[in-house]
UniProtKB/Swiss-Prot annotation:
InterPro entries hit by this protein: MeTrfase_TrmA_AS, SAM-dependent_MTases_sf, TrmA_MeTrfase, U5_MeTrfase_fam
Residues reported in the UniProt entry to bind S-adenosyl-L-methionine: 189, 217, 222, 238, 298
Catalytic activity: uridine(54) in tRNA + S-adenosyl-L-methionine = 5-methyluridine(54) in tRNA + S-adenosyl-L-homocysteine + H(+); uridine(341) in tmRNA + S-adenosyl-L-methionine = 5-methyluridine(341) in tmRNA + S-adenosyl-L-homocysteine + H(+)
Keyword set, alphabetical order: Methyltransferase, S-adenosyl-L-methionine, Transferase, tRNA processing
SUPFAM superfamilies: S-adenosyl-L-methionine-dependent methyltransferases
Entry EC number(s): 2.1.1.-, 2.1.1.35
GO CC, alphabetical: cytosol
Gene name in the database record: trmA
Catalytic machinery residues: 323 (nucleophile), 357 (proton acceptor)
GO biological process, one term: tRNA methylation
Entry function: Dual-specificity methyltransferase that catalyzes the formation of 5-methyluridine at position 54 (m5U54) in all tRNAs, and that of position 341 (m5U341) in tmRNA (transfer-mRNA).
Pfam family, one: tRNA_U5-meth_tr
Protein's UniProt name: tRNA/tmRNA (uracil-C(5))-methyltransferase
Organism: Psychromonas ingrahamii (strain DSM 17664 / CCUG 51855 / 37)
Length: 365
């Protein structure tokens, strides 16, 4: 995405094109009317990753054009939060003033939240020592006069924290506040305002549900915690250890006690639920204690594997959140044989790109 395509005046036209494309692609499944949730036109991304270019004494941010592969200089990054844009030039000037901080620096990552917290990760092609730490603390102290900021230094097999490596996001969802720990260098929803709308849509889809919820690919508990109030119990799976720990942190932060998170992949859980394998990680969990009538899946771009699709078909209600319309369509070729689409949504997580985040709610025929 080159920055000239970030065109707020053309946003509605581009969104209409996404809606038209999604409607055409899924017409074969005869879904209900598409619900569309727009993004803020600017400053919608809570994170950004920018390369750093060295040119003599000069130092500046760059990005690469995906088509031409040519680098271009970046002074501001309109998709990123206003906080990140305000910080970018101030941070760069301080880094430029320090030979220790600028030497072998090749990338700066930003992770912000709606409350004004920001984590800055400085990535290096060198090992970091005590001299680096002294300089990092110096510029942090300077930036704390203007920003609620923390720093991380990264190099090969090295990570140095200046206090902590996460922000606490606060989302307004269905009349309630939800708090989420979001850890640097792990997956989080990039578009906070669209995430709020996505969670509210999922809550509305499942509002009168019976029994329990099973969620695969739960991440940091983004959906599990928001939907917990609609179910007796929630059983959630996630393969990434930092995300599991973050989900447990978030449960405590929000006072939610009817969610259980287990560390295993969707494929492993399919084997467990089918009785094909026993897992030590499930030794304290009796799967028969859960009466899961509803399943939520939010898979990676590759979608659901064939065995997981078959397992998902056993549930009365399926809530499928997808970041890849092509794999969603492929999975629906099977799921639509046993289930009917009752809700169909587009969440514009990634404005000015071809990517569409979609949601479908299916009920067994």
């Amino acid at each position: 995405m080159t920055l000239q395509f970030v065109d707020p005046e053309n946003y509605e036209t581009l969104l209409a094109a996404k809606k038209e494309h999604l409607n055409k692609q899924f017409a074969i499944f005869n879904p209900p009317a598409l619900e569309c949730f727009a993004s803020p036109k600017l400053h919608y991304r809570m994170r950004a990753e920018l390369r750093v270019w060295h040119d003599g004494d000069e130092l500046y941010y760059i990005m690469f054009d995906k088509k031409t592969k040519q680098k271009f200089r970046v002074e501001q990054f309109p998709p990123a939060s206003e906080l990140i844009n305000n910080l970018m030039p101030v941070l760069l000037e301080l880094v430029k003033s320090s030979e220790i901080l600028r030497y072998k620096l090749f990338q700066i990552d930003f992770l912000s939240n709606l409350k004004g917290q920001v984590i800055v990760s400085l990535l290096y092609h060198k090992q970091l020592d005590d001299n680096w730490l002294v300089e990092a603390k110096r510029i942090k102290a300077e930036l704390l006069k203007q920003f609620d900021i923390n720093f991380i230094g990264r190099a090969r097999k090295q990570k140095i924290l200046l206090d902590y490596d996460y922000v606490i996001e606060e989302l307004q969802v269905d009349g309630n506040k939800l708090f989420y720990q979001q850890i640097e260098n792990s997956f989080t929803q990039p578009n906070a305002k669209v995430c709020e709308k996505m969670l509210e849509w999922a809550i509305d889809c499942t509002r009168d549900s019976q029994g329990d919820l099973l969620e695969l690919y739960c991440g940091n508990g983004n959906f599990s915690l928001a939907l917990a109030k609609n179910f007796n119990k929630v059983l959630a799976t996630e393969i990434a250890k930092p995300s599991v720990e973050s989900a447990q942190f978030n449960m405590a932060q929000n006072g939610i006690n009817n969610v259980t998170v287990i560390r295993m992949s969707a494929e492993e859980f399919t084997q467990a639920i089918n009785g094909e394998r026993e897992f030590y990680r499930l030794k304290e969990i009796t799967l028969s204690d859960y009466q899961c009538n509803t399943i939520l899946v939010d898979p990676p771009r590759s979608g659901l594997d064939d065995e997981t699709v078959k397992m998902v078909q056993h549930y009365d209600n399926i809530l499928y959140i997808s970041c890849n319309a092509d794999t969603l369509s492929r999975n629906l070729e099977v799921l639509s044989k046993t289930h009917e689409i009752k809700r169909f949504a587009l969440f514009d997580q990634f404005p000015y790109t071809y990517h569409s985040e979609a949601g479908v709610y299916l009920v067994k025929r």
